[in-house]
Amino acid sequence: VTGAPVEHLPFDQVDYWDEFKSILDWASTHVFSTMYLCWGAMGALNYRYGVRKVDLPEKIFGVFPQYLQDEYCFLTNGFDEIALQPHSRLAGVNEADVAANPDLQVLTWGPQSGPGLIATRDFSEVFALGHWEYGKTTLQEEYERDMAKGMSNVPFPHNYFPHDDPHLEPLFAWRSHANLLWRNWLNWVYQTTPYDLTEVPGLRAERRLGIDRF
């Protein structure tokens, strides 16, 4: 479930909020594991677990370090202790709400960008607050778009252009960790999804989707 540039709005003011919730309701009984990206992650965390969105005065924009919080998690298998992750958002999540929920675990975290990867304990839902799916020039294109709009709360992208020179080709410094995340997640989904999908609701209800079945 992808993001959208609507994180500055209250959830109930997003035109498709009701449709978004209905998709999540359907997925909870029909989908083995769902990955949410950026606003999709914020919306799902709020609707499913009551995690509040926190509006930011300035956009978190650029490539930021994320520190592993669980070096033995299969989702981050192969990650270095520090992984770079692109971020591009005007909001975050209330970290106290995440910490207070026993169903949630923070897998990566950064001092500037906060949680970058969160998952449920059974991994039926994975929440990426950053953008490991971004291509090499995506942040550059977003920066040029926002500058053309005259947005004053968008800083120059952090740790992206060599020597902070926008005339130089940006560095694709997150590609290896992005590939690891997708491969780890898809391999787990492939290995553990039951042939009979009618078993999914029961497995999710019993929280039996985790690595104990891998």
What positions do the PLM features span?
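Pocket-forming structural segment of enzyme catalytic cores
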Residues: 47-138, 206-210
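Soluble or luminal CAZymes and related metallo-dependent hydrolases
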Residues: 15-19, 110, 173-181
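Tryptophan-centric aromatic hotspots in well-structured domains and transmembrane helices
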Residues: 39, 64, 87-90, 142-143, ...
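Active-site-adjacent beta-strand anchor residues
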Residues: 35-38, 129, 175
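Active-site-proximal cofactor/substrate-binding loop regions of enzyme domains
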Residues: 1
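Cysteine-nucleophile active-site neighborhood
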Residues: 4-70
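Acyltransferase
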Residues: 132-214
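Short C-terminal domain-edge/linker segments immediately following a structured domain
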Residues: 28-34, 65-68, 97-98, 116-119, ...
